[in-house]
Amino acid sequence: VLFRSNNCLILKTMKTHLIAIFCLVSISLMGQKTYAPAWESLDTRPVLSWFENAKFGIFIHWGLYSVPMWSPKGTYSEWYKYWLDRKTLLGNGDFTGTEVYDYHKKMYGEDFTYADFAPMFKAMSYDANEWADLFKRAGAKYIVLTTKHHEGFALWPSKEASKSYGRPWNSMEIGAHRDLVGEYVNALRKTDLKVGCYFSLREWDNPLYNRETMDLFYERHFFPQLKDLVNNYKPDLIWADGPDSMNDKIWQVERTLSWLYSESPVKDSIVVNDRWANNTGRNMGIIIPENIAIQIVHIISLGRSVVA
């Protein structure tokens, strides 16, 4: 375009610069989006496109329960400690309840406790790079690893784990003496696979884990431990599990998600599932199929439409 005077040229140049500045400011403000610790605000956060397009993921259960590696068909072997200590058993089948206890006593002796498996969990054959290569060749888009299951044993150097249980209770201090989560994350980051971290809410034998002391459990253990995991490994996905029969107020879910979405180092990229409390299924980006079934039964029991 030709201009008849310098004034026109200057005006056009200024307009271009103003547009550029406006775009930069807009982008900056988008990056500064924060979410208040309230569902009205948290619910406005969209599901990130990477997860909507990731149709195939791989879920890995791996921990101390991998040492005995046994439970009757139709039951969860990762619940070995619970079955052992409570002498009960739930699942698909007819059980007396003492199957795991009887097996454990026969294999390891009556005085051998679940904690005695910790020195045996050495992960000698673990090669995270081999895992990543296998997952990539399988066509997976994201992976989820159990960084901590319901017995509280952590696969990274979590000081909260050992402090709460009064003994070495993470893979750096006992057993493998390795940061298993760190190796997993580093291997996946060499590929385009998304990093998922399973994080258990419940901890069967944590001294603070009961309804009367949930505030202390949250402040002293749960929240600082979650922050440690997120700050150190910056996962793309947090898979929460095990809220038991406690709601979002007890678990302080709004506070947790507000931090994840607004302050954490992954605030613009993190995806979460729907198991942060017993009533958060319809507030999250991911709704797990078995949770949908529970919600449908609840809706029908109230005489409402399945389509809310």
Predicted segment positions?
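Alpha-helical and His/Cys-centered functional microenvironments
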Residues: 11, 21, 65
